[in-house]
C-alpha cells in the first residue's frame, strides 16, 4: 500500500499551490492523509478529485467552509491497521502521552502541526 501524508499546507497563504512532486505522490498513492490546516476549500476539492482515497480532518486555521466538510478526527482501518488523523492543537509538551490517553484504540496516529 502506498501512502501520501500531508499536513499544514496553508494554501494559498504559504504557497500558491502544491509542488508537482507532491501531486505525483498523491496520484501514485493508494491512500492520501491530510492532517489539517488546508486554509483553502479549493485544495480539498482538488485533492479529493486526484486521490484514490482521501482521509482528512480540519485544522485550527480552517474556517467554516472546511469544518463543515471535514471531521475533527478521521479514522480508517486499512489492511487490519487502524489509522487516526487529527490536527491536535494542544501544547507540544506532553502531546504523545496526551494522544495515547485520548486515542488509545489506534495503531498509527497522524498529527498536524508538522
Model-found features: residue ranges?
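Conserved catalytic scaffold of divalent metal-dependent phosphoesterases
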Residues: 3-34, 38-114
Amino acid at each position: 500500500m502506498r501512502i501520501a501524508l500531508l499536513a499544514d499546507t496553508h494554501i494559498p497563504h504559504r504557497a500558491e499551490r502544491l509542488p508537482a512532486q507532491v501531486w505525483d505522490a498523491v496520484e501514485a498513492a493508494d491512500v492520501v492523509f491530510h492532517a489539517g490546516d488546508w486554509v483553502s476549500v479549493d485544495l480539498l476539492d482538488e485533492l479529493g478529485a486526484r486521490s484514490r482515497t482521501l482521509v482528512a480532518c480540519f485544522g485550527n486555521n480552517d474556517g467554516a467552509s472546511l469544518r463543515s466538510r471535514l471531521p475533527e478526527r478521521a479514522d480508517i482501518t486499512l489492511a487490519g491497521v487502524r489509522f487516526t488523523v487529527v490536527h491536535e492543537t494542544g501544547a507540544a509538551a506532553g502531546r504523545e502521552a496526551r494522544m495515547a490517553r485520548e486515542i488509545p484504540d489506534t495503531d498509527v496516529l497522524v498529527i498536524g502541526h508538522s
